[in-house]
């Protein structure tokens, strides 16, 4: 009987140790201490630092779209080592995400299509760039057109 009691106590001890914070960027004072710190804007990333980090491997920005797991997102991994939490731009969407690009909602885990990110602030995503993108696409027309 004493062997089973020591096994139970060992299991309870392991459970108490396992309830520790597993996230590499847990703040001093535990998870609840985050509520006391003011949020800041997330780090810039991507080509020319035109984007903002939305997660450890997610970089989104105006006219850039979203980059996932590319070399441009490596800087976003540094965000895990900063003591204060950050808040990416855009309005709230999804479960805990924010609008990252037109029609795209991102959180720290990934991105998904979201209609609530299409409507609303047209200036937040640079609508004037749409004309430039269309002009850019028209320049890539096939050079050998058949004339009838």
Curated annotation (Swiss-Prot):
SUPFAM superfamilies, alphabetized: Neurophysin II
Disulfide linkage: 21-26, 42-86, 45-59, 53-76, 60-66, 93-105, 99-117, 106-111
Annotated signal peptide: 1-20
Glycine amide: residues carrying this PTM: 29
Any single GO CC term annotated in Swiss-Prot or TrEMBL for this entry: extracellular space
Cross-referenced InterPro entries: Neurhyp_horm, Neurhyp_horm_dom_sf, Neurohypophysial_hormone_CS
Statement: the UniProt record of this protein carries the keyword Translocase: no
Keywords associated with the record: Amidation, Cleavage on pair of basic residues, Disulfide bond, Hormone, Signal
GO MF terms held by the record: neurohypophyseal hormone activity
Keyword hit for Signal: yes
Superkingdom field: Eukaryota
Family, as annotated: Belongs to the vasopressin/oxytocin family.
Chain's role: Isotocin causes contraction of smooth muscles.
Name of the featured protein: Isotocin-neurophysin IT 2
Organism: Catostomus commersonii
